[in-house]
Amino acid sequence: MYQKILVPVDGSAPSTRGLLEAIKLARDDHAQLRLVHVVNTIVSAIDYAAGPGSTIDPSTRTNDADVAALKRAESLVTQNGLNSEPVLLSTVTDNVGELIVRQAKEWNADIIVMGTHGRGGLSRLILGSNAEHVLRHTQVPVLFVRGQPGN
């Protein structure tokens, strides 16, 4: 049924639950998996303190935790006997959800499988909702996998 499954990953428990569901789908359908981790490289106060002559390029800032999250996801796929294509994206200005939508369109994904924290109310308002953005702006079917209660 699905040939190309896009899976946003961030290293969180809900993200891992989404990945495990995507692995099941991929195994059943012999589908390709693309793992996408988006780094939002907001310029920190330290970067501003470096001054106007600074050579710091915030668009290239990733850290070991970002790379490790993607590698852990890739390892989980491999442990389940499948292959995946990891993609690390970086943004300063774009909404993380928008990059996921764009990636799904560019890759011609058949479905996006996404773990969600299931936050609502004030929490969602403060934290934003990548899941909601993806749902509202993609033309691709989306499967949300909720985290465990309390996560």
Language-model segments: residues:
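Short, hinge-like loop/turn segments at secondary-structure boundaries
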Residues: 50-54, 103-105, 130-131
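Glycine-rich, Arg-bearing micro-motifs that act as flexible, cationic patches
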Residues: 111-133, 151
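Short, well-ordered secondary-structure micro-motifs
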Residues: 18, 45-48, 97-99, 124-126
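Short, flexible loop segments at boundaries between secondary-structure elements
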Residues: 142-151
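Small/aliphatic-rich secondary-structure junction motif
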Residues: 3-55, 76-85
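A short acidic, glycine-rich active-site loop
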Residues: 53-68
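Structural beta-alpha unit
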Residues: 75-112, 150-151
